[in-house]
Every structure is written in structure tokens, then in C-alpha cells.
């Protein structure tokens, strides 16, 4: 394919930024908005679940989820996400991006509602059905990662492609914030409608029966934004790169893009045949010798950096409520009633999202096509390492009265540089550097490696952060939060080293980056 490029792809690469680009960002981005809401809202209600289903009124403190239950509730959706990323990533290359794009959204809507309707006669029954539905919710969420990234990368022009993909991913920040806002509104409403004493002042009375509705409403509310965008997902045409390069129908690709870009594109039939013929010998498969030679190092880079990043990112996100409790930013559980605790946790998460998480995403949108992917990812990992060390080394200082605000500010900066850094770039790069016929699959593999890291973070941090001298009930002694933060700092440092393998794709077409236009014999003589 070295002898030319299809006109429709050249037109896409040089198209001016226009209304349809922004529509694509919103349509794909609302999926990520819902993904983040559904994945992280569980951290807002897990303490409430412990109070409702595991409280022993003879105890001095309200109930909490047992270790194995807490790990399952927090981590099962991540297991589903990993499976969904692999399956839908592969399916997106086999059947087309659009063909399976709507199904992931339907699965998310159905399972989100079902999660809120979890049932059972015992605590174990409720938790079991909740975990079942959250696994399949995660499965649908997993499909959104490779499909949304691939669709946006294949629609975008090469000048602002990074910003467009980053903007889709940035909707994750608004999803996290929206989850906190929903929890604030719901808990405030129930708190005012059904006042209750703290656990210390009235153990049984601190948990009103209506509190069972709180967590269910919060879990189900994520269906709203997903359902609103389903129609528009179904209206999107298949990407031109899939239609032209994989389905080998350049004429249809030109017709589809002519409609959405308001530009008349006439694809030359002879050119299309020549390009197709040129690519016929370039159809090596995943993990073939040619793939390993061209993209083996790239796959190591995108999987390892995403894996290392998500260990830290999901540890921080899913268990920030526990960290804030231990440093004293959230009062002890026994001094609050059940609904008040949800309100306090949601308020803390909203502040972190507003001050650290969301700004970081949009700094990436602003600078990704200026500084480049490599520089932002390297800088992000480096700064996360620095701030993690800044939290861990003087940890005892941060836990003393009067220093909690400083801890929260430092903690917020780790989120800022995660999102103005590797949390965004690990999503962007795999959507750019692999050939069209393997793009969705390789993005799915990279994302699944990330979710493997998230599972390590979700299950590992819960146990590792336990106080070595005074672990919580049901837990074995761990290494403590201070040492756990040191481990996360080391994880970020390893991510910085692995970033050295990541190629730069700024300002290049997808075909130039992936060398899809270069045959094996041409590459060998280059």
C-alpha cells in the first residue's frame, strides 16, 4: 500500500474540525460518563451496605463488609470489564465497530438497573445477586473502552486526534463527579426526610429502614445518561477505516463520510483496487512473526504502562473513603448515622473530582497535540511518584490534627497528574499505533491489562493497607497505609520506566503511525 492512500482517508486526516466531530465526542463520551459512574459509585455505598447487612448491635462500631465480601463487591465489576474488553475488542475488528457498539450500552443499562434491584433473603443472597449483575455490568463497560477509542481515532483528523480521544475519555471525570452529586442529593434527601441519631447515640435507630433505598437508587441512576445516547449511537455510520480497509468497500466509506462531514468525496475505483491489492500481502495476524517484529514492543509498552497505572489509580479511587477516614477527614463511623456517612463520603469524592480529577483530564485535552503523548505520560508518572512519596514519607505528619487539609491537597495532585498523564495517554496511544484490522483487539488487550492492574489494586490494597498492629475486624495485619503508599509510588516509577518504550504518534495519520501503508519487503529494505 505504499503507492497511495485512499482519498476518503486523506480527507478525514485533513478535515476541518466541525460539528460532527463534537457529536462523536459526546456520543462516545457519554458511554465513558456512564462507565465511570457505574464503576466508582460502588465506593460511595459500600460502607452503607456493611451497615445494612452486617451490623451487630452488640458491637461498638457499625457493621462493615467482611474482607472477602468487600473485595468481591469492589472488584467483581472490574473482572467483568476485563473480560468485556477482550471480547468486544476482538468482536469490533471482526464484525465492525458500529455493529457491537449499541449492544454494550444496552447491557450496561439493563445490568445497572438489575444491580439496584438485587435481592435475597439473607445478606449473602443480596451480595451474591449484586455481584452477579455487576460482573455483567462490567462486561458491557469493558466493550466501551476499545470501541469508543477506536471509533473516535478513526473519525478524527490527524491534527487534533489526540484531543478528540482525550475529550471522550475526559467524560470519565464528569461521571465520577456525577456519581458523587447523585449520592449527595439522594443522601441529603433521605437524611432530611428520615432523621436518625448517630450510631453511638442509638445503635438500632441510626439505621432507618429507608436507607436500603439509598444505595439502590444511586446504583440505578447511571442508566439515565446511557439510555439518552442509545439512539445517537445507532445513527452513527461505520468508521471509514473499517469500511475501506477491512470490509474493502471504499466507495461506501466515501459515501458515509460525505454525509457526516458535509464534503463530497468521490473515491477513485482504480485507486481503491490498487490500495486493496497492495494490502493483500500485509494481512498478518495477531501474534504472528510480522506482528511481533512490528508491534511486539508496542504491545509490551501499552499493556505494562496501563497495568501499572491502574494499580495506583483504582487503589486511590475505590478506597479513598478508607484513606480519608484514617487521616481524620471523614469522622469516625460511630459518630454518624448510616445516611450521613454516605453524604460525607460523597462530599469528599466530589471535592477530589472537582479539584484534581476533572482539571487533569482537560489539561490533557488542551496539551496532548502540543506536547505529545510520550511527554505527558512520562511527566504524569514522574509527578505521581513524587506526590505519592510526599504523602508516604511524612504520613504521620498528615494524620495529626490540623494537617488533614494538606493531605487532601497532596492527594488531589496525584489524581491531577494521573489524568494529566498516563490515565489519559494509556487510553489514547493503543487507539493510534496498531493497524486497522487489529486496532480494536489490541486496544482491548491493552485495556484488559489495565483492568488486571485495577483488580490487583482493588483486592490487594484492601488487605495491604491494614494496620499491622490494629487491623479492622476480619482482616489480617497488613503493611499499613504508609507503606502501601510507598508501594504505589514504586509502581508509578516502574510505569515511568516502561513509558520509554511508548512511540510518539502526534501529528501523524493512523496509517503512518501503524506503518499500515508499508509492506513487509519495503520495511525490510528501509
From Swiss-Prot:
Residues 43-70, 121-124, 185-211, 316-349, 395-407, 466-483 are extracellular. Residues 1-21, 92-99, 146-163, 233-294, 371-373, 429-444, 505-526 are cytoplasmic. Expressed at low levels in roots. SUPFAM superfamilies: MFS general substrate transporter (SSF103473). It holds the Pfam family Sugar_tr. InterPro entries: MFS_dom, MFS_sugar_transport-like, MFS_trans_sf, Phos_permease. The chain crosses the membrane at residues 22-42, 71-91, 100-120, 125-145, 164-184, 212-232, 295-315, 350-370, 374-394, 408-428, 445-465, 484-504. Although related to the sugar transporter family, it does not transport sugars. This is Probable inorganic phosphate transporter 1-3. It comes from Oryza sativa subsp. japonica.
Amino acid at each position: 500500500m505504499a503507492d497511495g492512500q485512499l482519498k476518503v482517508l486523506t480527507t478525514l486526516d485533513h478535515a476541518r474540525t466541525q460539528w460532527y466531530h463534537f457529536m462523536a465526542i459526546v456520543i462516545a463520551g457519554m458511554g465513558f460518563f456512564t462507565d465511570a459512574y457505574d464503576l466508582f459509585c460502588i465506593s460511595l455505598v459500600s460502607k452503607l451496605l456493611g451497615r445494612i447487612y452486617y451490623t451487630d448491635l452488640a458491637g461498638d462500631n457499625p457493621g462493615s463488609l467482611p474482607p472477602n465480601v468487600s473485595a468481591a463487591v469492589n472488584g467483581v465489576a472490574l473482572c467483568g470489564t476485563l473480560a468485556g474488553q477482550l471480547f468486544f475488542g476482538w468482536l469490533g475488528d471482526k464484525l465492525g465497530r458500529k455493529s457491537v457498539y449499541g449492544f454494550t450500552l444496552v447491557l450496561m443499562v439493563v445490568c445497572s438497573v438489575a444491580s439496584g434491584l438485587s435481592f435475597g433473603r439473607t445478606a449473602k443472597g443480596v451480595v451474591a445477586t449484586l455481584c452477579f449483575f455487576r460482573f455483567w455490568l462490567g462486561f458491557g463497560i469493558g466493550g466501551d473502552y476499545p470501541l469508543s477509542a477506536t471509533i473516535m481515532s478513526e473519525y478524527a483528523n490527524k491534527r487534533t486526534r489526540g484531543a478528540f480521544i482525550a475529550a471522550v475519555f475526559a467524560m470519565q471525570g464528569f461521571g465520577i463527579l456525577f456519581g458523587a452529586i447523585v449520592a449527595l442529593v439522594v443522601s441529603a434527601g433521605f437524611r432530611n426526610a428520615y432523621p436518625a441519631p448517630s450510631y453511638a447515640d442509638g445503635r438500632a435507630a441510626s439505621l432507618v429502614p429507608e436507607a436500603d433505598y439509598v444505595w439502590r437508587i444511586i446504583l440505578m441512576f447511571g442508566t439515565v445518561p446511557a439510555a439518552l445516547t442509545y439512539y445517537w449511537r445507532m445513527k452513527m455510520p461505520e468508521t471509514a477505516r473499517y469500511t475501506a480497509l477491512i470490509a474493502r468497500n471504499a466507495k461506501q466509506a466515501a459515501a458515509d463520510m460525505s454525509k457526516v462531514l458535509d464534503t463530497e468525496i468521490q473515491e477513485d475505483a482504480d485507486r481503491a483496487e490498487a490500495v486493496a491489492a497492495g494490502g493483500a500481502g500485509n494481512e498478518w495476524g495477531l501474534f504472528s512473526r510480522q506482528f511481533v517484529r512490528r508491534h511486539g514492543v508496542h504491545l509490551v509498552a501499552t499493556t505494562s504502562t496501563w497495568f501499572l497505572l491502574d494499580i495506583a489509580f483504582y487503589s486511590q479511587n475505590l478506597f479513598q473513603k478508607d484513606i480519608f477516614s484514617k487521616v481524620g477527614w471523614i469522622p469516625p463511623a460511630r459518630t454518624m448515622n448510616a445516611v450521613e456517612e454516605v453524604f460525607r463520603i460523597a462530599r469528599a469524592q466530589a471535592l477530589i473530582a472537582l479539584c484534581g480529577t476533572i482539571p487533569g483530564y482537560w489539561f490533557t485535552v488542551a496539551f496532548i497535540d502540543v506536547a505529545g503523548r510520550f511527554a505527558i505520560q512520562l511527566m504524569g508518572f514522574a509527578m505521581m511518584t513524587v506526590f505519592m512519596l510526599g504523602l508516604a514519607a511524612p504520613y504521620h505528619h498528615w494524620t495529626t490534627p490540623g494537617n488533614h487539609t494538606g493531605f487532601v491537597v497532596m492527594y488531589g495532585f496525584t489524581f491531577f497528574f494521573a489524568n494529566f498523564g498516563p490515565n489519559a495517554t494509556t487510553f489514547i496511544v493503543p487507539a493510534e499505533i496498531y493497524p486497522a484490522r487489529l486496532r480494536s483487539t489490541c486496544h482491548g488487550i491493552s485495556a484488559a491489562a489495565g483492568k488486571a492492574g485495577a483488580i490487583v489494586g482493588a483486592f490487594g490494597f484492601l488487605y495491604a493497607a491494614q494496620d499491622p498492629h490494629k487491623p479492622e475486624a476480619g482482616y489480617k495485619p497488613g503493611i499499613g497505609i504508609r507503606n502501601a503508599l510507598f508501594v504505589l509510588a514504586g509502581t508509578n516509577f516502574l510505569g515511568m520506566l516502561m513509558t520509554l518504550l511508548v512511540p510518539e504518534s502526534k501529528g501523524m495519520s493512523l496509517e503512518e503511525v501503524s506503518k499500515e501503508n508499508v509492506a513487509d519487503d519495503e520495511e525490510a529494505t528501509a
